[in-house]
Amino acid sequence: MTSNIGITRAHTNIALIKYWGKENKELFIPMNSSLSLTLEAFYTDTKVELTDALTEDEFYLNGTRQDEAATAKITRFLDLFRSETGDTRRTRVESLNFVPTAAGLASSASAFAALAGAMNEATGLQLPAQQLSTYARRGSGSATRSLFGGFVEWNKGDSNENSMAIPVDDANFDIGMIIIVVSAAEKKISSRAGMELTVSTSPFYEGWVTSAATDLADIKQAIKDRDIHRIGAIAEFNGMKMHATMLASNPPFCYFEPESIIAQQTIRTIREERGIPAYFTMDAGPNVKVICKASDIPAILEELGKVFPSEKLIPT
């Protein structure tokens, strides 16, 4: 019996310039480039073992063997590496998620980035991180950006080979995030379904794609300048424009809950009345992420704590 083992840790990320909509659904090539901040506090550890002792792939998540449907998705991803290497041995995948699901943080980004990294090691491919990100992308679009720390761009590209992650900045300055947990309930409309509806029906969508390119260029300059006000303002504007495309879809849909609006208003009040640079962004869900200086997190938590219970506030 022969086996090869690979072990990798990958961190989740929060998009500041959003990805919303696919140009190529099969290859997960997006309609626009995006940019995220990797969260060092939240990650997935994955171990893979390629072995001829198995007749089918096995997938364990947090110690529990997963069902056929979940394993089938993993198998499709593993097949990308089998196709590249010619190694058809079945694989045991063991993943541990250290991502607070109650915070509404998608673990798919860190999960598929970690799986790609582990397979890269076990198969002996040893692809550089940028090239490996083209594999991670095929599992989950946002996983493309989880191969690097700090600020990371997912360059849209126009092919499987060049739609990849590009490290922008190590984020080694005074920047942090707070997650406001509004709801941990399952979304009524999945991100995939929401994207498809928006792309096909929203009259605002074309403008969103154009403006996202401008936002990306602007935020990269703001990052270079270490300007937290500009970083936050651009991210807030970009996120709200994305949600506006959904409101104009047919039929319209919205991920906001009443508490999402309260959180937005509270953050604006902190910014305008306390003079603390605090900005918000939201993904395809009701939870709100606060972009701020890491040194301001205690003061912002104090203000948010007047509105939300402490267990709903997660600093990173």
Where are these regions (language model features)?
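Conserved hydrophobic/aromatic beta-strand scaffold that supports enzyme active sites
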Residues: 45-47, 151-153, 177-179, 289
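Short amphipathic alpha-helical segments
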Residues: 69-73, 111, 128, 259, ...
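Short, glycine-/Ser/Thr-/acidic-enriched flexible segments
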Residues: 13, 21, 42, 53, ...
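C-terminal nucleotide
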Residues: 3-10, 169-316
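Gly/Ser-rich oxyanion-binding loop with an adjacent helix/lid
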Residues: 83-172
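ATP-binding N-lobe of GHMP and related small-molecule kinases
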Residues: 1-103, 117-127, 303, 314-316
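Fold-independent oxyanion-binding glycine-rich loops
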Residues: 10-13, 19-20, 96, 109, ...
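Short, solvent-exposed loop/turn segments at the edges of secondary structure
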Residues: 30, 39-41, 147-149, 173-175, ...
